[in-house]
Amino acid sequence: MRTLASVVALALAAAAPPAAAADTVHYRLSATLDPAAHRITVAGTMRGPDGKEQPVSVDKVIHHPIEAQGEDYARGFAETTGTIQSEGVFLSGASDWYPRWGDALVTFDLTVTLPAGWSAISQGKRSKNGDQVRFSCEQPQEEIWLIAGQWKETTRKLEELETSALLRERDDALAAKYLDATATYIAMYSKLLGPYPYAKFALVENFWETGYGMPSFTLLGGKVIRLPFIITSSYPHEILHNWFGNGIYVDPKSGNWSEGLTAYLADHMFAEQNGGGAAYRQETLQKYADYAAHAKDFPLSEFRERHSPSTEAVGYGKSLMLFHMMRREIGDAAFVKALRTLYQEKRFSRSSFDDLKSAFATASGKNLNASFAPWVTRTGAPQLRARDVQAALHGDEWRVTGTIEQTQAEEPYTLAIPIALTLEGKDTATQTVVRTTGKETSFVLTAKEKPLRLDVDPEFDLFRVLDVEEAPPALSGAFGAEACTMILPAGVNPEVLTAYQQMANAWNEGRATPMKVVTDAELAELPQTGSVWVAGFENKFAKAAAAALEPYHASVTRTGDRAVVRVARRSKGSADVIAFVAAPHAVQLSGLARKLPHYHKYSYLAFEGDEPVNVEKGRWPVTDSPMTALFAAGDVPMAKLATRDPLAELPPAFSKERMLATVNALAAPAMKGRGQKTPELDRAAEMIASAMKDAGLEVLPADPEMKNVVGVLRGAKPEWKESSVVVGAHYDHLGMPQDAKMFPGADDNASGIAVLLELARQMAGSGKPSRTVIFVAFTGEEAGLLGSKRYVAAPSPWPANKTIGMVNLDTVGRLASGKILVLGAGSADEWIHIVNGAGYVTGAPVSAVMNDPGGSDQKTFIEAGVPAVQLFTGANADYHQPTDTPDKIDGAGLVKVAAVTRELVAYLAERDRPLTSKLGGAASKTAAAPSGERRASLGSIPDYEFPGPGVRITGTTPGSPAEKAGLKEGDVITKLGATSVATLRDLSEALKALAPGDTVDVTVLRDGQSITVPATLAAR
């Protein structure tokens, strides 16, 4: 088995630098930096392509301002051509700190003398000697970079590869996280593309916010580095640039191909790895349509760099879609072969789009002139329409006929158009490709089964201008609109009105055509054309926004202190949108002004707090795409499409197979449901203790009163010796009642134990955390949280009142296409940040649910004053049923749950201060007496993400009182008997006061009407 280090070592061994090109210039330089005086002095020699050596002498002040560039308000980065100052040094070839020889590539030996406590970074091998740093770069480069600062440096060696993190303040945990990621990404891309081309890679923290990728290092701003999603988005993108862009250089005469290719192999590939490739492409096409397609488009051959949303939509979006179409055209094997060959032959030289086309053609043996060149040289994109699509029975065979049109005014493109046909009785779709070179192409498909629907380009594989009904309305429709009006609420207090005005001003900066900004008092009606922002709950046009949102059942009414954003089409088929934005407090609006451009792909958002913090986001469903033809009445879902493997996979941190094996063992028939006080439950405890020991945990002696299984991973910081993070999951279930039906408890909660044990293995193998992490398999949860109550009450070296936070894993095995719900996120201010960060880092779908129904072991910790959450993959009809079996567990989902849990626990293990508890001083109070165990069940399946008031249900369990009473999906329970129900906990408490067999009135809201039905409760 190859280790990560050995993979990297093999890659480096094959990465010998090519001989310098004949037109390369070699520099031998000594530079001295005086940051306080903004001065650099340089002495040395340069040897030109003619072989003649010339002296170099430079003595100059360089202190150019750091200024925002272009209209890229969504990114907010500033730039400089060069600066030397006390905060740091940033010099590129454009800074003229050394003489340049035209466009010639360079090699160099550079020695930099620095003030005490300073260090420097550039290309090439790096060595230090006192206050001097030397760089030796044999690989031809486009320019010489010189960056300097006062950093705390962490370095690791992977065989011959040196990886470093240079941070302005010491942060060992952050450095370790980035160094782990560096090794992982370099190994993955070396395997995919060929050997990493340099002897080092460094993460360098800049003294202002930047996002630069240089050969062998990346220069990121301090805030950027600490954004949770950067390590799985921008960071691999910058590492990959060492192959394309900083390994093979862009021929400046041909257009910049490297950004699109890098975005495809990093950002898009990571989305593919998480099952989101089609969604990523849909968002890419929507961004092109909203920002560039109509007035700001240009050929790829003219793209040089991003400086606005429109240049990004073309230079990154259109380009990555070109590479995706090439991959679909020639196949994965030929696509990868072409990239590897290009890298091997063109490393440290300049390449063009034509070189890429030749590489793809050679690898595939195909003539790609018609399917490649037009995307580079032409402005625009095809627009598709499917018409006259019909299904008819001919004898014993069904025929589906139709015509696909290219409706753009320009010449047609050569296209391979994917089509998916959903057939009656078939789980998987029949997929084919229709090839077209003209404006119209007819097709005939045949099938034995009855066709139900046909979808054209269902996975957004073609670069094209989307029909507006193919994608949901999103903020990009407002930010990208040429004609846009922002309507402010005249009737609000002056502070809030000023904040809305400042928001409009911020968004107008850099716009080619500024938004028109007016108040609602100045208008009798909405503008007839263009997109519109309606600002403020009090705005008289809020009703118009609400009317436009009716198809999505969305509201614009104020809910507490939430800031809300909602987007709808102004009319069906219109590209113009109406965007509603409102916040109760002026302080929230400054944050929204800064943040919303980053959320351009979303249809709806909600924020809380002063910052404010995002707590809800999403895209409306697409319900009426013109690229879909239905042959049957009703809402017919598209059948499953063939799975596609990503071009490369990250090495898994967690074993799906091992977790499924744990579930199978605990839920096996021989375990008889792991009922209370049974030999089988004792056997489960022994299995768990053995697994913890094998994982490397210190397993504590069993408590004779309550058989919790406790494994400890001791922390490294002695000053935190009493502090801990608790990770919990209960291992008991309902056993085998008198009717002899076994309740396997696979999801509830063998799944939680499986994730807990896998996380223990991973964390124990990754070195000591700063704070002790305690893994607890609780018993007695089904009998009233007995095990967790015993843990909290019992004497311990890690007392409950020193626990920074608790993460509970309960019923986490049925993720599928749903979300990982994190219940109880309202128990501390920071949970929402931690949860959102975990979602960004892992790519897993997460939702922080502020309320906590209080049904599992986290409740015990919350009552003891410990901020605690439960991870949960949602209720289902098999809950507490004999049908909760191992075959229904989603192994891939367990991996995602484990990844999210690791992020939560790792953060808590390194956090240097307590969480900001929202438990109302519970830590200093005696926990309330339990209100009793719930015995009665209604059988409704709650929607845990519904914020209330009331409990919305997603369905009912078969044969349950709720089903018999006629409750159905979408109902909102507002009353049980005489008890009002505002939250899920209210419903749970109301049921505790009732018994099986009781008949109670259930009041629900259905389609805006309140109805009451009787239900006879069953045993839980």
Task: Label each PLM-derived region with a short phrase.
Residues 711, 727-785, 901:
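Alpha-helical metal-binding/catalytic segments enriched in His/Glu/Asp
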Residues 909, 915-1020:
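C-terminal recognition in membrane/secretory proteostasis and scaffolding
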Residues 472-649, 653-654:
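Solvent-exposed alpha-helical segments and adjacent loops
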Residues 20-196, 328-330, 346, 382, ...:
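Acidic/His-enriched low-complexity segments
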Residues 170, 177-178, 184, 768, ...:
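Metal-dependent peptidase/peptidase-like ectodomains
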Residues 368-369, 382-457:
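Beta-strand-rich binding/interaction modules
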Residues 661-665, 674-714:
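A non-catalytic alpha/beta surface segment that caps or lines the substrate-entry region
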